[in-house]
Amino acid sequence: MDFQKECQQLIDRYVSYYRKGDAAGCASVYRPEAEMYSPFGPPAIGRRAIEAAHKEWVSEGADHKKINVVSAGRSGGLGWCIARFSEDTTDSGSSMNILTRGPDGCWKISHCSLTEN
């Protein structure tokens, strides 16, 4: 499968959790030691901190959240993707994600940096 499509599948799973208000599900697409940097709050280091940040975000509701992977690439077990996100008519931005493939062959996010438009 094309790597960009693999990334989109991972992001689609994340969006599904987000729309349901499932912060733990959102955090599950990240590595346990992942780092997330966002203009919407302080840096979140580790899956627990990422889940805590998402608890606040999903409580605000996001039935219309969309994320589209616009480019992606990989070399061996290391990959990246750039995605555009939107939640409604006012909130939008980009994310740069570094992904690693685990021993099980599954890709997860190890580093994420969000930028608001």
Role assignments for model-derived ranges:
Residues M1-P32, R48:
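Short, low-complexity N-terminal intrinsically disordered segments enriched in polar/charged residues
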Residues P32, G77-G79, D104-G105:
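Beta-strand-connecting loop/turn residues
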Residues Y37, A44, K108-S110:
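Generic structural signal for well-ordered beta-strand positions
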